[in-house]
Curated annotation (Swiss-Prot):
Its EC number is 3.1.26.11. GO terms for molecular function: 3'-tRNA processing endoribonuclease activity; identical protein binding; zinc ion binding. It comes from the Bacteria. It comes from Bacillus subtilis (strain 168). This is Ribonuclease Z. Binds 2 Zn(2+) ions. Homodimer. PANTHER family: ZINC PHOSPHODIESTERASE ELAC PROTEIN 1. Keywords: Endonuclease, Hydrolase, Metal-binding, Nuclease, tRNA processing, Zinc.
Length: 307
């Protein structure tokens, strides 16, 4: 599980920062990539990475402002030209379906793969045997969501050496033991599968704030997460601007991370007014409150290790 920041700017593209998009690379877990937001020219940014558009399985949109969605039509269309055949699902607020379908219709774009579009509400928006994705409403003046990606605990590996020492040869019985079932062997012995499994590996979690003012719902969503990706459009001295425009400051993001007991904070969605050394100062403002903070930049990659 890795994060790759494709765009870390706010509002409009800048020379050093494209508008918002973050890739969650799940290549080991499910051989796919999930995107969170898809600002203008996200597909251009992808060209500078190892991401293959056909591997993009899901796109989660936090809200319908242009700097978070204008890259969708181009990316969806290009995916067809780049070998995309597997279904892609887009999740987002009301309006996302009309935006995508209208864009594809008026440009007469034909997709070579199934496209599903889900307009979401608060709650669980996706779940399978590996992951659960939860959305909560955040405060941005329009309908907007934050997302938590929670990996489910991974069952412990089978203690095959112990089984062999007990003269239990490999075979279908190993699958039952691996599921934790109680098994009766051919010689009459009864064993509990859980006794032959290593401890389960705790699932990892990543939270994406989207654009928001300080939000109690977001803080709860981020409780004990491994990584909190939080917008920091403004420096702490610009607190009033942040409030007026429904955004957060570096300091506010850091306080949220601290109160949520997140393990790591990554700042993104940084205004173009902060260039060069000024953007380094943003990171320092967060570190002063929450030491394990970093200000993202375009193409930053962050591994999400198991605890």
């Amino acid at each position: 599980m890795e994060l790759l920041f494709l765009g870390t700017g706010a509002g409009i593209p800048a020379k050093a920062r494209n508008v918002t998009s973050v890739a969650l690379k799940l290549l080991e877990e499910r051989r796919s990539v999930w995107l969170f937001d898809c600002g203008e020219a996200t597909q251009h940014q992808i060209l500078h990475t190892t991401i293959k558009p056909r591997k993009i399985e899901k796109i989660f949109i936090t809200h319908m402002h242009g700097d978070h969605v204008y890259g969708l039509p181009g990316l969806l269309g290009s995916r067809s030209f780049q070998g995309g055949e597997d279904e892609l699902t887009v999740y987002g607020p009301k309006g996302i379906k009309a935006f995508i379908e209208t864009s594809l219709a008026v440009t007469k774009t034909h997709l070579t793969y199934p496209l599903a579009i889900q307009e979401i509400e608060e709650g669980i928006v996706f779940e399978d045997d590996q992951f659960i994705v939860t959305a909560v409403s955040v405060i941005h003046g329009v309908e907007a969501f934050g997302y938590r990606v929670q990996e489910k605990d991974v069952p412990g590996s089978l203690k095959a050496d112990v089984l062999k020492e007990m003269n239990i040869p490999p075979g279908p019985v190993y699958q039952k033991i691996k599921k934790g079932e109680t098994v009766t062997l051919e010689d009459g012995r009864i064993i509990n599968g859980n006794d032959f499994l290593e401890p389960p590996k705790k699932g990892r979690s990543v939270v994406f704030s989207g654009d928001t003012r300080v939000s109690d719902k977001l803080k709860e969503l981020a409780r004990d997460c491994d990584v909190l990706v939080h917008e920091a459009t403004f420096a702490k001295e610009d607190r009033k601007l942040a409030y007026d425009y429904y955004h957060s400051t570096t300091e506010q993001a850091a306080v949220t991370a601290k109160e949520a007991r997140a393990k790591q904070l990554i700042l993104t969605h940084i205004s173009a007014r902060y260039q060069g050394d000024a953007s380094l100062e943003l990171q320092k403002e967060a570190v002063d409150v929450f030491p394990n903070s970093v200000a993202a930049y375009d193409f930053l990659e962050v591994n999400v290790p198991r605890g």
